[in-house]
Regions:
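Short hydrophobic alpha-helix segments
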Residues: 199-201
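Short proline/glycine- and polar residue-rich coil/turn motifs
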Residues: 203-210
Length: 211
């Protein structure tokens, strides 16, 4: 819809109506860098753009309204984006398009079940083809392979090898309020896909710290 007078007035009304209740931030993608959005919410910025705006800084949080499209064989660039997001505090995440495939469970003439979409409901029916099947999980919430990439990028504990020969790692606690001593960490060491060592360790690492 773009931006303009009505959106300016709507922003001011929301701020007044919400005052003293929750004082929630407002975001409106098409406002871009104008004053009637409390965060900058672009669509599909590249990893290099996120790196650039993170390094330069911004007058408000940057939270892409869409930054990864989970349709088909996708989300391969997610980690490149999250490396920048984790590095710069003005980058505060983003929204994946989207969570779940929007298919409907039906049966074919042989009784086999499948997820129907688009043209499955007739050639003369309105259809966006398979564009409604763009989630990281199936309609029954079974995960797509893309879910593994999302899980890795969003994990709250990260490990970085500092001296592999001597088994030394840095452990980063990405939680904001939880010490890692609340968890028991299990690990395995593999050689040619065979487990040669396994163990458990408890670590005292404060939120947003590494050890």
């Amino acid at each position: 819809a773009g931006n303009g007078y009505n959106f300016y007035e709507a922003y001011l009304w929301v701020k007044q109506a919400d005052k003293g209740l929750m004082d929630r931030p407002v975001n409106y993608e098409r406002a871009q860098w104008e004053w009637n959005s409390d965060m900058y919410v672009p669509q599909y910025p590249s990893a290099s753009w996120l790196e650039s705006i993170g390094r330069l800084g911004s007058d408000r949080p940057v939270v892409p309204s869409e930054y990864a499209h989970a349709m088909g064989n996708s989300t391969g660039g997610l980690w490149d984006q999250w490396k920048a997001i984790y590095q710069y505090p003005n980058l505060q995440g983003g929204y994946i398009w989207d969570w779940v495939d929007q298919g409907i469970l039906v049966k074919d003439e042989n009784g086999r079940e499948y997820w129907a979409y688009g043209g499955d409901f007739g050639t003369n029916m309105p259809s966006d083809g398979n564009f409604c099947c763009n989630g990281i999980v199936n309609p029954d919430r079974n995960p797509h392979p893309a879910m593994s990439e999302v899980k890795y990028a969003h994990q709250n504990v990260a490990f970085e090898a500092t001296d592999l020969a001597n088994g030394k790692f840095n452990v980063l606690n990405r939680f904001y309020f939880t010490n890692l001593k609340k968890y028991m960490i299990s690990y395995e060491v593999k050689e040619n896909d065979k487990v040669v060592r396994r163990g458990k360790v408890s670590l005292d690492v404060a939120p947003q710290e590494k050890k």
